[in-house]
């Protein structure tokens, strides 16, 4: 039987081996956002903040402009 390979039978016993050192992954590590994604979120937040401040300031600035035009 020197060069022949033994055919694997379907009823052979299979052994499970576990690694001695276990690597643990936290859910936060897996779902952590990349720097490009964090930059996109920051950019979106900044745009929303600008829009909300513009809404507040435009009323005040337009009122002041109208007062100056009346004088």
From Swiss-Prot:
It holds the Pfam family PP1c_bdg. Belongs to the asfivirus DP71L family. The keyword Isomerase does not apply. This is Protein DP71L. One of its GO terms (molecular function) is protein serine/threonine phosphatase inhibitor activity. It comes from the Viruses. Disulfide bonds: none annotated. Interacts with the host phosphatase PP1 catalytic subunit (PPP1CB) and recruits it to dephosphorylate EIF2S1/eIF2alpha and therefore restores the host translation that has been shut-down by the host. Also inhibits the EIF2S1/eIF2alpha-ATF4-DDIT3/CHOP pathway. GO terms for biological process: regulation of macromolecule metabolic process; regulation of primary metabolic process; response to endoplasmic reticulum stress; symbiont-mediated suppression of host innate immune response; symbiont-mediated suppression of host translation initiation; symbiont-mediated suppression of host type I interferon-mediated signaling pathway. Keywords: Host-virus interaction, Inhibition of host innate immune response by virus, Inhibition of host interferon signaling pathway by virus, Interferon antiviral system evasion, Late protein, Modulation of host PP1 activity by virus, Viral immunoevasion. It comes from African swine fever virus (isolate Warthog/Namibia/Wart80/1980) (ASFV). Interacts (via C-terminus) with host PPP1CB. Induction: Expressed in the late phase of the viral replicative cycle. Residues 16-18, 57-61 are annotated as: Important for host CHOP inhibition. InterPro entries: PPP1R15, Prot_Pase1_reg-su15A/B_C.
